[in-house]
Amino acid sequence: MKAKLGIAPIAWWNDDLAELSDDVSLEECLRQASVAGFTGMETGRRFPMDMAELGPILAKYGISVCGGWFSGLLLDGDIEVEKDRIAQQHAFFKAAKAPCIVYGETARSVQGIKSAPLATKPKLTEAEVAVYGRKISDFADWCAKNGMPISYHHHMAAVIETEAELDLFMKHSTVPLLFRKLLSCLLSSISFSEK
């Protein structure tokens, strides 16, 4: 049985704290991932977002784009504005033949605010989650209909983080969670060979 495995560049550098591991180049990251047996890599801050430039670099290491973070603002924003915000990444991921965009809601998040304790993260009522769930479901449907589905990434310091928040999110939305979507992509790429 063969499976394709992908990894995120956060194993080599941190997009939120640029000063961490700034000495690791994109090519070194891809080389090490390839040697370790990974065939997919999420995008990160060192990735050119143009397949004409990125494609040959990925091909050199036998790596493909398997996803990548999008900092969503739909909780407090307008769906049409969010479509405009994601359009460039949407087009790039289609060109890269990526399985999905990783959508993380960053509106109201305390992530990156070093003086803010994690306990001060925003919390939504069930009624607010229901409104957000309908909004993100409509947005996810639009993304999928236009050729690039999203997977939802719950995240520390964000409005959807805890198990209880995930339960409410799943109750009020149709958006697949990141681990479920990636597992589905992984299982669909498994092939059996006789040996």
Q: What are the functions of these language-model segments?
A:
Residues 1-18, 66-72, 109-119:
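N-terminal small/glycine-rich loop or linker at the start of catalytic domains
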Residues 1-42:
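Non-cleavable N-terminal signal-anchor transmembrane helices
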Residues 1-2, 30-35, 48-67, 84-99, ...:
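Acidic (Asp/Glu)-rich catalytic clusters
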Residues 3-9, 41-43, 65-70, 101-103, ...:
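Hydrophobic faces of well-ordered beta-strands that scaffold small-molecule active sites
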Residues 11-25, 44, 72-83, 121-129:
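Active-site mouth loops of central-metabolism enzymes
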Residues 20-22, 55-58, 115-118, 164-167, ...:
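Short, glycine/charged-enriched secondary-structure capping and boundary segments
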Residues 40-53, 72-84, 156-162, 183-192:
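Acidic-and-aromatic substrate-binding clefts and catalytic sites of carbohydrate-active enzymes
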Residues 79-178:
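Active-site acidic/histidine proton-transfer and metal-coordination neighborhood
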